[in-house]
From Swiss-Prot:
<dbReference type="Pfam" id="PF00103">
    <property type="entry name" value="Hormone_1"/>
</dbReference>
<keyword id="KW-0964">Secreted</keyword>
<comment type="function">
    <text>Growth hormone plays an important role in growth control and is involved in the regulation of several anabolic processes. Implicated as an osmoregulatory substance important for seawater adaptation.</text>
</comment>
<feature type="disulfide bond">
    <location>
        <begin position="52"/>
        <end position="163"/>
    </location>
</feature>
<dbReference type="GO" id="GO:0031667">
    <property type="term" value="P:response to nutrient levels"/>
</dbReference>
<dbReference type="InterPro" id="IPR009079">
    <property type="entry name" value="4_helix_cytokine-like_core"/>
</dbReference>
<dbReference type="InterPro" id="IPR001400">
    <property type="entry name" value="Somatotropin/Prolactin"/>
</dbReference>
<dbReference type="GO" id="GO:0046427">
    <property type="term" value="P:positive regulation of receptor signaling pathway via JAK-STAT"/>
</dbReference>
<dbReference type="InterPro" id="IPR018116">
    <property type="entry name" value="Somatotropin_CS"/>
</dbReference>
<dbReference type="GO" id="GO:0005615">
    <property type="term" value="C:extracellular space"/>
</dbReference>
<feature type="disulfide bond">
    <location>
        <begin position="180"/>
        <end position="188"/>
    </location>
</feature>
<protein>
    <recommendedName>
        <fullName>Somatotropin-2</fullName>
    </recommendedName>
</protein>
<dbReference type="GO" id="GO:0060396">
    <property type="term" value="P:growth hormone receptor signaling pathway"/>
</dbReference>
<dbReference type="GO" id="GO:0045927">
    <property type="term" value="P:positive regulation of growth"/>
</dbReference>
<dbReference type="InterPro" id="IPR034975">
    <property type="entry name" value="Somatotropin"/>
</dbReference>
<keyword id="KW-1015">Disulfide bond</keyword>
<dbReference type="GO" id="GO:0005179">
    <property type="term" value="F:hormone activity"/>
</dbReference>
Length: 190
């Protein structure tokens, strides 16, 4: 295999994370439009199903906190977040059979796996092949539920999609912080 420059690895990882975050936001909006009446949208944001497992790990919650962490830590957090979604996203296409979600769900899983490989490559290049992230987040998210006629299931899936969107935003932020820190660019915005 030819050596890929570190800057290219970061660029590819950031692009994948941006794409996944946008896809997660689109899926969330499509689900909301299709399944959640306006009056339920606000009440569900405060429900226990809106709790994200990622809130249980000591990961930075924004770019200012992320800038205080090492690149290795940010990569470990990113890998833990991504790996917590791999199993749940395998079932996504079975849940939403007739919408934008269905059309994009297989792509989401593939892109998530690509991003996981990219982060593993970055960790290897930065000398962090030990993958210390396994201790960060042992939990994975629940599977998406297929019974969309049940309100509890709707809220659960809505909460999962909300968490996926938040987690992909975190990964995107962490990767951008690392890239900007390492490669001073004129268009480096967070």
């Amino acid at each position: 295999y030819p050596m890929i420059p570190l800057s290219s690895l970061f660029t590819n990882a950031v692009l994948r994370a941006q794409y996944l975050h946008q896809l997660a936001a689109d899926i969330y909006k499509d689900f909301e439009r299709t399944y959640m009446p306006n009056e339920q949208r606000h009440s569900s944001k405060n429900s226990p199903s809106a709790f994200c497992y990622s809130e249980t790990i000591p990961a930075p919650t924004g770019k200012d906190e992320a800038q205080q962490r090492s690149d290795v830590e940010l990569l470990q957090f990113s890998l833990a977040l991504i790996q917590s979604w791999i199993s749940p996203l395998q079932s996504l296409s079975r849940v939403f059979t007739n919408s934008l979600v269905f059309l994009t769900s297989d792509r989401v899983f593939e892109k998530l796996k690509d991003l996981e490989e990219g982060i593993v490559a970055l960790m290897r290049d930065l000398g962090e092949g030990g993958f210390g992230s396994s201790t960060l987040l042992k939990l994975t998210y629940d599977m998406f539920d297929v019974n969309l006629r049940n309100n509890d299931v709707l809220f659960k899936n809505y909460g999962l999609l909300s968490c996926f969107k938040k987690d992909m935003h975190k990964v995107e932020t962490y990767l951008k912080v690392m890239k900007c820190r390492r490669f001073v660019e004129s268009n480096c915005t967070l």
